[in-house]
Amino acid sequence: LNLVTKLEELMVVGYPFEVPAEYSSLPQLLGRATVAIETNKGDLQVVVDGYSAPVNAGNFVDLVKRGFYDGLDFNRAEDFYILQAGDPPGEANGFIDPKTNKYRAIPMEVLVKGDDLPVYGETLEELGRYLDQPVIPFNSYGAIALARPGDDPNGGSSQFFFFKFDTEVTPPGYNLMDGRYSVFGYLTEGKEVLEELTAGDKIISAKVIEGIENLKEPE
């Protein structure tokens, strides 16, 4: 996957679209970045894809840069196929921006194959696009997506989850997950570590090791 990522980056000239102005107050990743995550059971490496989900990817890279995830537990493991982290201590369920003292809410964002720019604010199901396929689907092991309240596609913040491939839930072509969550990256190293991680395990540290120059800070 790393080699494929490098080749794809060489093929991209400039950034292919403009993120809607209404999201200018949020970090954006205008390209790709690589994040190394050290856990108590070993190391993971992920590629964060701002070409497919610049706002969700930018939010994640910004929080990694801040050290937000360092020391946080994996707080949820469901049916052996979801592993979630990013819930901070205290009452807040996400990131409270110190500049505004408000919860940073991140929009639903998914780029569909054949579209020029992502869909924002609604799930593909809500839009009636049931069979459309996202550029980054859930049917590859270790896809990373933004966790969110079940009734609010725009209510996610800092919590994210790894999706451990499950053929019953994510068959090729159409599945129950694609288009319902914002996928912003994928695992490139550490599959055997991800398989062992569960609720109660810990992120020791997360660091951006490549692509930080692609992070655009909020205006």
List each model region and its residues:
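Cross-family detector of peptidyl-prolyl cis-trans isomerase
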Residues: 1-219
